[in-house]
């Protein structure tokens, strides 16, 4: 990235908040400037204006998409770091062709995903959606499958 004391870091849309307020942002200060936008860009034009001149883009989840059309307009871009396990918000083929590294966080939230899956399994086994709809309709019938039998 050439001069590592003058890197332009951009967070183009931290919505919902994931990066803003993190004490770890201070660790970037010795290396360059950080621009963080707390809302999502409304269109590609605004997205590109926010990312103009960026060498590093820190993307929160999949809120902001990086298609070939966008990546080709960012000649200085060298890295897209996503705060997610997936990379589906980035055109990986275009990034590779343009020599842009893409990093994600695989496995970082695995315990939470596993916990959520177990919760969903219980919800299906106990017909939680159906039971909720019945209660909201004012019907309080006999509960079936209450003990997972």
How should these model regions be labeled?
Residues 98, 106-149:
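Phosphate-binding beta-alpha-beta segment of Rossmann-like dinucleotide-binding domains, i.e.
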């Amino acid at each position: 990235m050439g001069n590592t004391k003058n890197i332009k870091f951009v967070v183009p849309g931290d919505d919902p908040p994931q990066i803003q307020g993190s004490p770890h942002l201070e660790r970037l200060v010795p290396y360059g400037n950080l621009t963080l936008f707390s809302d999502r860009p409304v269109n590609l034009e605004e997205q590109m204006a926010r990312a103009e001149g960026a060498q590093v883009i820190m993307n929160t989840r999949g809120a902001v998409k990086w298609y070939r059309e966008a990546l080709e307009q960012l000649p200085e871009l060298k890295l897209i770091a996503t705060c997610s396990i997936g990379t589906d918000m980035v055109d990986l083929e275009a990034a590779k062709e343009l020599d842009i590294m893409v990093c994600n966080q695989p496995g970082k939230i695995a315990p939470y995903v596993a916990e959520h899956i177990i919760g969903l399994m219980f919800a299906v086994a106990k017909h939680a959606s159906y039971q909720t709809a019945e209660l909201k309709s004012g019907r309080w019938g006999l509960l079936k499958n209450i003990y997972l039998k």
